[in-house]
Design a protein with these regions (language model features):
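Conserved hydrophobic site in ankyrin repeats
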Residues: 217-220
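Structural detector for tandem alpha-solenoid helical repeats, activating at a conserved register
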Residues: 35, 212-215
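Structural signature of tandem-repeat unit edges
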Residues: 1-13, 20-35, 45-58, 68-187, ...
Length: 232
């Protein structure tokens, strides 16, 4: 939706100032919102987090054009309704931390969605441009069935992350799945725990920025029972 400009000095205005450009860092959208027009967050360069309900029915084209800083999505899911989450993810190609909540606000899953980017490469003999995709993030953006996230499909993509992404990315993705094991099978749990045990060097790097992250991660990797689900 288009935002009105801020008033000139001395000019009166009603309501809140425009939320646009470098002023928006975190935006929370109401449950009653059903439509966002084209280029709704155009050039919100400092936007980092977006909280929204999955029931938004219409998202305009170019919704996040110029929003390369978005790094966190917090979505409240409405049961038995079409979800807009796949469309939102399709508009953002960067690495994203995704929190999924039920209608009461309780966290049901925390996921890491890796990045991807596309580039046009010239095929000189054929005189055509070939679109090449880099990174495994595009695969994660298709882990949906009838707009609902499919955890088994998400977990099945972990081998791609291990090959194409940095160890820190793979470790954080694994930690999220162990911390919130919604739909996590025993075989998938094993693959995540095995990766963390085989890459102890990531503990040191992660510990520099989040000591609690390190402590809880170590507990999960060392335990032999079920994954722990915290209250966040």
């Amino acid at each position: 939706a288009m935002m009105r400009k801020e008033p000139r000095p001395g000019q009166k205005q009603e309501g809140m100032p425009a939320i646009c450009g470098d002023k928006a860092e975190s935006v929370s959208l109401p449950k009653t919102l059903v439509r966002i027009g084209k280029y709704g967050f155009y050039n919100c360069e400092k936007l980092r987090k977006l909280t929204f309900w999955s029931s938004i029915r219409d998202l305009g084209a170019g919704l996040f054009t110029g929003c390369r800083g978005v790094e966190e999505l917090d979505v409240w899911m409405e049961e038995e309704k079409k979800s807009c989450l796949p469309e939102v993810l399709a508009e953002l190609s960067q690495t994203l931390r995704l929190t999924i909540r039920d209608q009461t606000g309780a966290v049901t899953a925390k996921l890491l969605i890796p990045e991807f980017f596309e580039e046009s490469v010239e095929n000189t003999p054929a005189r055509i441009l070939v679109l090449e995709t880099h990174g495994c993030g595009h695969r994660y953006r298709y882990c949906f069935r009838q707009t609902q996230m499919q955890m088994p499909e998400y977990d099945a993509l972990f081998p791609y992350v291990c090959v194409e992404e940095q160890p820190e990315t793979a470790a954080q993705l694994a930690w999220y799945r162990l911390w919130y094991p919604s739909g996590l099978s025993e075989s998938s749990k094993k693959q995540y725990k095995t990766y963390l045990k085989e890459h102890p060097e990531v503990y040191t790097k992660l510990n520099k920025t989040a000591e609690s992250f390190f402590v809880e991660l170590q507990k999960i990797v060392d335990e032999s029972g079920r994954g722990y689900q915290g209250n966040h």
